[in-house]
Amino acid sequence: MNSRDGLLAEIKNKAVVHGKVILSSGKEANYYVDLRRVTLDAVAAPLVGEVMLDLTADLEFDAVGGLTLGADPVATAMLHAAAKRGRQLDAFV
């Protein structure tokens, strides 16, 4: 199984919540996708880094980041995946 397929399986198994869910808006939904359950997971987070590096392979960049809280674990996962590949990549928040 490649990283992308593994990540998809992790998302389906850990991030998708089925059943009645009350959203922060107060509205009701039949399902909810909580990707924090993936980006902060010991098995899934490395897959996030691998897949994000693969998806951005054609771009030139030296650092990754975004709005704090949501982007922090993604940037960190990419930093570690890059190091594993022998590439120096910084993260910022």
Task: For every predicted segment, state its role.
Residues M1-L59:
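Active-site-facing substrate-recognition patch
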